[in-house]
Swiss-Prot record:
GO molecular function, one term: tubulin-glutamic acid ligase activity
Family according to the record: Belongs to the tubulin polyglutamylase family.
Biological-process GO terms, alphabetical: protein modification process; sperm axoneme assembly
Underlying gene: TTLL1
Organism: Bos taurus (Bovine)
GO CC, one annotated term: cytoplasm
Listed name of the protein: Polyglutamylase complex subunit TTLL1
Residues given in the record as ATP binding sites: 138, 144-145, 181-184, 194-196, 241-242
Length: 423
């Protein structure tokens, strides 16, 4: 389509604006005709609100799905994954198989989690089974480590309840909802420090599901060496990897920002644990991401004007088992280091190359499966249409940690690489 793209954003970040200007796009206000709006989650709520009566035209696209929170709100993500497991179980899917103790063999990738106040009685029952465990409490709708704390006694929850002016956990209240999850107290450590992975995943459509993994993810390290000691439960520099918290620590390094690239992690693990187990670990991480997206796909409003770049947070335990901690709808575009700035600029550049082909005025009927040469540092993680064409046999061969058979873990079809083609 002829003409220049008219853009708007309510997120004033240089990595965004520089990418728009590089393309020769024209900045306008939200009250003018626009084609591309990179917006906050608060704004997307208003845009798709029934009350506003706003309707997007065919030449407008935005960077969030209307109900992205089905994946990015901590309580709803867990709820959808639990529902997904039960549906697979009901269908008799081999993916829902359990071991003798009742644990899922292939879908056990989220720590045991309860919603508070709704699931308080269920939580107490579980807590009493293993009273020496540590649990982590998080507000459902906050980010950057805000409002998070660890507990190892029921009395701590009761105190929190009183402090929050909540009379009872048994009934629903107007107070802020929390999730409480079993704390992964045996994290893989490097240099004695806990870390997590921040991985970027772009979804162009949920039905059919098509998603892309960004190759340049990174690890975020704590500044203080890890200890499971109860005396350090309140020390968030030991337990939380969020840069928003760690940058206030005495030992925070402003040059590298306490970060490693995922490629460096891979090389480290290959040299210390071996290539085979490292490959298996990354296969399982890809598996987790695809299954989490499949879990929310049926309830996601797959609006044709939308795409979304998510920030996945994964923790690896000392047995090299990956755990999905949460998914962020607005991964930080703030640059804490020079390398960070380059990474995030390239992330936005590659995202725009897929979402707005050739930098031209968008068409909501855009080709959501672009050719490989425009992907940049993205790789196709899962393409439902290709996977369906591969038959049910792949479902049985592609469970995490198992060989994918003679085809391997990569399927090349029509010039596109599919990293994981799990059914």
């Amino acid at each position: 389509m002829a003409g220049k793209v008219k853009w708007v954003t309510d997120i004033e970040k240089s990595v965004l604006i520089n990418n728009f200007e590089k393309r020769g796009w024209v900045q306008v206000t939200e009250n003018e005709d626009w084609n591309f709006y990179w917006m906050s989650v608060q704004t997307i709520r208003n845009v798709f609100s029934v009350e506003t009566g706003y309707r997007l035209s065919d030449d407008q696209i935005v960077n969030h799905f209307p109900n992205h929170y089905e994946l990015t709100r901590k309580d709803l993500m867990v709820k959808n994954i639990k529902r997904y497991r039960k549906e697979l179980e009901k269908e008799g899917s081999p993916l829902a198989e359990k071991d003798e103790s009742g644990k899922y063999l292939y879908l056990d990738f989220v720590p045991v989690t309860y919603m508070l106040p709704a699931d308080y009685n269920l939580f107490v029952e579980e807590f009493r089974k293993s009273p020496s465990s540590t649990w982590i409490m998080k507000p459902c709708g906050k980010a950057q480590g805000k409002g998070i704390f660890l507990i190892n006694k029921l009395s701590q929850i009761k105190k929190w309840s009183r402090d929050s002016k909540t009379s009872s956990f048994v009934t629903q209240s107007t107070k802020e909802a929390y999730v409480i999850s079993l704390y992964i107290n045996n994290p893989l450590l490097i240099g004695g420090r806990k870390f997590d992975l921040r991985l970027y995943v772009l979804v162009s459509t949920y039905r059919p599901l098509r998603c892309y993994m960004y190759k340049l993810g990174f690890c975020r390290f704590c500044t203080v060496k890890y200890t499971p000691s109860t005396s350090e439960l309140d020390n968030m520099f030991v337990h939380l990897t969020n840069v928003a918290i760690q940058k206030h620590g005495e030992d925070y390094n402003h040059i590298h920002g306490g970060k490693w690239t995922v490629n460096n992690l891979r090389l480290y693990l290959e040299s210390t644990r071996g290539k085979e187990v490292t490959s298996k670990l990354f296969d399982e991480i890809h598996w987790i991401i695809v299954q989490s997206l499949k879990a929310v796909a049926p309830v996601m409003n797959n609006d044709k004007h939308c795409f979304e770049c998510y920030g996945y947070d994964i923790i690896i335990d000392d047995k090299l088992k990956p755990w999905l901690i949460e998914v962020n709808a607005s991964p930080s575009l703030t640059s804490s280091t020079a390398n960070d700035r380059i990474l995030k600029y390239n992330l936005i550049n590659d995202t725009l190359n897929i979402a707005v082909p050739n930098g031209e005025i968008p068409d909501c009927k855009w080709n959501k499966s672009p050719p490989k040469e425009v992907l940049g540092n993205y790789e196709i993680l899962y393409d439902e249409e290709l996977a369906q064409g591969d038959g049910a046999e792949r479902e049985l061969r592609s469970r995490p940690g198992q060989s994918l058979g003679p085809k391997g873990s990569r399927l090349r079809d029509a010039g596109r690489t599919v990293l994981t083609t799990w059914k």
